[in-house]
Amino acid sequence: MIINIHINFFMTTISSVFKKLDKQCALIPFITAGDPDLVSTSKALKILDQHGADIIELGLPYSDPLADGPIIQAASSRALKQSINLNNILDMVNITSSNIVAPIVLFTYYNPVLNLGINNFISAISRAGIKGLLIPDLPIEESDYIISVCKLFNIELIFLLSPTSSIERINKIVEQAPGCIYLVSTTGVTGQKPELTGKLKRLTETIKKMTQKPIILGFGISTAEQIKEIKGWNINGIVIGSAFVKRLSSDFPEEGLRKIKDFCTTAKSIIIS
């Protein structure tokens, strides 16, 4: 893999975003790389950065996305049919990241990391300008080495925490997580869910008492009502995925870009209001 390096003096780190926002909630949109095409993905990253995104999550298309709902699965399938892969995604990110401030988190399953080799994978995404990494199927019991490699390359590894986790499991993840913790809002896959629960709110309160590490919430958040509710939970970030992916997958790329711009602007205005 050969990447021409474009040094980015503007993109911030994930931890610095949370420090800057202090108690304000970060807006974290998710989009799938290569859907509808890589040119549109590059434009989408810039649009999201310019219209309220504090951090941007970029999904690496994968053939067996167990944690993804139907909207994101379909987006991955469309991207893979165009021969979108890690190499051309990182080439695009390398060029685009020099024009944006919001740090990019790469969402990928563990298998692509293992196929390339942990050191090679982390080195490659770091050179391209990626600032964070989220691996939903990474077993915490196998995470020590990848944590050390991420630290070496200044990549912030984000751990997932399920709402069904035992207290013992929560303690282990909270203690081992090198940075922010991604709390899954519902059991099952990603997607647009109608409501959130009081149990989830109580869980966020419990975790906040256990750690000073930033807590972000995602999976199933898609409406203005949900954003309004969650921003009052004293969490550090809201991840919105399927709602952005669905809008971006419009019949015409420019229409999709307009839709995500409008939705990003709306979501940010709700958070800061």
UniProtKB/Swiss-Prot annotation:
InterPro entries: Aldolase_TIM, RibuloseP-bd_barrel, Trp_synthase_alpha_AS, Trp_synthase_suA. The active site is at E57 (proton acceptor), D68 (proton acceptor). It is an enzyme of class 4 (lyase). Pfam families: Trp_syntA. Pathway: Amino-acid biosynthesis; L-tryptophan biosynthesis; L-tryptophan from chorismate: step 5/5. Keywords: Amino-acid biosynthesis, Aromatic amino acid biosynthesis, Chloroplast, Lyase, Plastid, Tryptophan biosynthesis. CDD domains: Tryptophan_synthase_alpha (cd04724). It is found in: Plastid, Chloroplast. GO terms for molecular function: tryptophan synthase activity. Its EC number is 4.2.1.20. It comes from the Eukaryota. Coiled coil: none annotated. It catalyses: (1S,2R)-1-C-(indol-3-yl)glycerol 3-phosphate + L-serine = D-glyceraldehyde 3-phosphate + L-tryptophan + H2O. GO terms for cellular component: chloroplast; cytosol. Belongs to the TrpA family. The alpha subunit is responsible for the aldol cleavage of indoleglycerol phosphate to indole and glyceraldehyde 3-phosphate. Tetramer of two alpha and two beta chains. This is Tryptophan synthase alpha chain.
